[in-house]
Swiss-Prot record:
The name this protein goes by in its record: Large ribosomal subunit protein bL20
UniProt GO MF annotations: rRNA binding; structural constituent of ribosome
Entry keyword annotation includes rRNA-binding: yes
GO-annotated cellular components: ribonucleoprotein complex; ribosome
PROSITE patterns (alphabetical): RIBOSOMAL_L20
CDD domains assigned: Ribosomal_L20
Function noted in UniProt: Binds directly to 23S ribosomal RNA and is necessary for the in vitro assembly process of the 50S ribosomal subunit. It is not involved in the protein synthesizing functions of that subunit.
Domain of life assignment: Bacteria
Gene Ontology terms: biological process: ribosomal large subunit assembly; translation
PANTHER family, A to Z: 39S RIBOSOMAL PROTEIN L20
């Protein structure tokens, strides 16, 4: 049986983890064992929060549309139903942008939906 030398592989793996941990505080960026734990935790959080961001933005858009719609005397749920009936195909992101940046145009969209 020949001898297997793995020093380079281990060093490369540890350097990769420490490179990912750059910017972490204290031993979390210097010691391999703690850095490895923190990198795994950071990657897990990043994976989870990439999905959470989509939910958060959708909630923000709905809140903004609801606030702007109530100023026009209609609730969010009524507005979405009437938009569907009027065959106005604006998604929540577009409606929220209109509500924030161009309230006059949003008011016209609401009036059109009310029909």
């Amino acid at each position: 049986m020949s001898r297997v030398k793995r020093g380079n592989v281990a060093r490369k793996r540890r350097k990769k983890v420490l490179k990912l941990a750059k910017g972490f505080r204290g031993s979390h960026s210097r010691l391999f064992r703690t850095a490895n734990q923190q990198v795994m935790k950071a990657l897990r959080n990043a994976y989870r929060d990439r999905r959470k961001r989509k939910r958060d933005f959708r909630r923000l858009w709905i809140t903004r549309i609801n606030a702007a719609a109530r100023q026009q005397g209609i609730s969010y749920s009524q507005l979405t139903g009437q938009l569907k009936k009027a065959n106005i195909l604006l998604n929540r992101k577009m409606l929220a942008q209109l509500a924030v940046l161009d309230p006059v145009a949003f008011a016209k969209v609401v009036e059109t939906a009310k029909g």
